[in-house]
Amino acid sequence: MKIRASVRPICEKCRLIRRRGRIIVICSNPKHKQRQG
């Protein structure tokens, strides 16, 4: 999980989701997991 100021999808399987006011990227590739900090 990477904590970033700007979150963007890396590949076509990345999905942007809003959880508890935070933007999260979930993907089949675990390296692409991101959260806005």
Swiss-Prot record:
Q: Which InterPro entries match?
A: Ribosomal_bL36, Ribosomal_bL36_sp
Cellular localisation: Plastid, Chloroplast
Q: Name one GO molecular function term.
A: structural constituent of ribosome
Cellular component GO terms, alphabetical: chloroplast; ribonucleoprotein complex; ribosome
The alphabetized list of GO BP terms reads: translation
**May I ask which residue range the UniProt record assigns to the signal sequence?**
none
Which HAMAP family does this UniProt record tie to the protein? Ribosomal_bL36
Q: How does it assemble?
A: Component of the chloroplast large ribosomal subunit (LSU). Mature 70S chloroplast ribosomes of higher plants consist of a small (30S) and a large (50S) subunit. The 30S small subunit contains 1 molecule of ribosomal RNA (16S rRNA) and 24 different proteins. The 50S large subunit contains 3 rRNA molecules (23S, 5S and 4.5S rRNA) and 33 different proteins.
**Protein name (database record):** Large ribosomal subunit protein bL36c
